[in-house]
Amino acid sequence: MGEFKIHSKFKPMGDQPQAIDTILKSIKQGNEFQTLLGVTGSGKTFTMANIIENLQRPTLILAHNKTLAAQLCSEFKEFFPENIVEYFVSYYDYYQPEAYVPQTDTFIEKDASINDEIDKLRHSATSALFERRDVIIVASVSCIYGLGNPDEYKKLTISLRKGMQKERDEIIKKLIEIQYERNDIDFSRGTFRVRGDLLDIIPSSTSSKGIRIEFFGDEIDRIREFDVLTGTIIGERNHVSIFPASHFATSKETVERSLGEIENELENRLRELNSQEKLLEAQRLRQRTNFDIEMIREMGYCSGIENYSRILDGRAPGTPPKTLIDYFPEDFLLFIDESHVTLPQVRAMYAGDRSRKNTLVDYGFRLPCAYDNRPLKFEEFEKKINQVMFVSATPAQYELEHSQSIAEQVIRPTGLLDPEIIIKPVKGQIDDLYTEIQETISRGYRILITTLTKRMAEDLTKYMIELGVKATYMHSDIDTIERMKIIRDLRLGEYDVLVGINLLREGLDIPEVALVAILDADKEGFLRSETSLIQTIGRAARNSESKVIMYADNITKSMKKAISETERRRKIQTEYNEEHGIIPQTINKEVRELIEATKVAEESTEYGMEVTKSLTKKEAKKLIKEYTDEMKLAAKNLQFERAAQLRDKIEELKGKE
């Protein structure tokens, strides 16, 4: 059994040692909630890694989007190269849930494009939890959605040992039961092939390695691992576990029991609809459900089988679904990164799902059991927590009220201080800002400007360009790839000024930024709340010469709190630096880490061009093949936005064939 072991040339510095000790002491005392209040650039991820190494427990890290989850996953893989670090996010590249619009009598069928690479990673994550304890899973909030029952998943796992008495056909039968498909030609993940006394299987958790079972009569003579592409034998195995090809795989006994319950629920619901004289809805429900029942009876599953998961799991109506959290052992550790953003997402999930399901059930598209194929309610999520650490530079009220221990990480290993804050009047703010921009550019640095509206961001950018400033703007309409390209170009000096509305998202920690300007700082609201202001101020905390200018005629409560907190931190940091003889150093962050994303963006701009108009059918076919290969490679390298863009282009080309 492996143990967590950090590989890093760094040792905990600054506030990290005391933060690690405080959190560890709290967790070892059995406290359920703790918070790491770490300023931007203080090395919160490294602190988390040290806590994991010390406690040696399976760990779930929750992030608020796929991009941030992928970044964290990469960082933890570097810290723990000998251990298992997995990535668990929604496997949909595109997802349109089934819905019904009564006003227009329009039923929208579920439409989804599943990313095979992410599905593989999800299976890899769940199977790892059954095999080892040194496992870290970085997940998005989609992990609180219903997943198959872990007990059923474990029960259906096929355990094979060398020397075991087992007929080949019996294993084949079990593989089909857990949703593997026989395919002797297109041998891929989740399939098996048979050649005489050889049975080759590609497990659901990998696409590069296969398992070869060699039989001698009814005995397993040999188990070998091989490279799927080359066929080269990698090594011998004494034992292998084949996990189900679907998290919703169910045993025959469960299916038989469940079909009766589905039929009972159907009869009860039909009586209810008929009594309300909803004859069309009753007819629709009977037809749709009977079709699903026949599919389950014949195949063991149907499209949308997750809508019957409550019955398949044997749960009572209204009870919480099984999720990724249920695959963890009871003593697992939970980190919620950027908790001030992630927790509100967890809270909002259930309500959005319920309102859509109401319409489907009311109009006879689904049985009431579909209500229980859902994300967890917030209270249910809380009950599943063993011990949790919230991680944020600006923890919200929930985190602060619930935490029995709060560790502050104010000192940065680089000695950098929180930036100086200057308040200037709104009158003449644009002219003053232009002067400040010129002064900052003359020192070789960059500028971030945050406005309140998209229109203002566009107008200000246009005005700056007219004055000869290399400026651009960024808003929510710009996708992740284009966003990464803009950041990279800002860092390389293609632009000197970046204007935006909400510049708080991950990835905007840019060492070259020496000025952050906040326009209309005294307009109270979401974008000028204490949390938003502190987060925005933090964008200037990567450069030793940086400052923040707030343009305001009045000092609001939010401004006062944000300024006061920044000054408090700055005082602590200054005293620490003087005491230890530390000179603040601007972070030296290579632009290299954005090049892959930039390359993607540069290539994807070609995809948006009208190049398909002049293509012949043969050329279109060739291009489709090239894009398909590239899409699969992009997905494999976790470049999911690029893969999605390529997928859209493939669809467009198919229409031109």
Swiss-Prot record:
ATP binds at residues 38-45. Residues 429-595 form the Helicase C-terminal domain. A motif (Beta-hairpin) lies at residues 91-114. InterPro entries: Helicase/UvrB_N (IPR006935), Helicase_ATP-bd (IPR014001), Helicase_C-like (IPR001650), P-loop_NTPase (IPR027417), UVR_dom (IPR001943), UVR_dom_sf (IPR036876), UvrB (IPR004807), UvrB_inter (IPR041471). GO terms for biological process: nucleotide-excision repair; SOS response. The beta-hairpin motif is involved in DNA binding. Forms a heterotetramer with UvrA during the search for lesions. Interacts with UvrC in an incision complex. The UvrABC repair system catalyzes the recognition and processing of DNA lesions. A damage recognition complex composed of 2 UvrA and 2 UvrB subunits scans DNA for abnormalities. Upon binding of the UvrA(2)B(2) complex to a putative damaged site, the DNA wraps around one UvrB monomer. DNA wrap is dependent on ATP binding by UvrB and probably causes local melting of the DNA helix, facilitating insertion of UvrB beta-hairpin between the DNA strands. Then UvrB probes one DNA strand for the presence of a lesion. This is UvrABC system protein B. It comes from Clostridium botulinum (strain Eklund 17B / Type B).
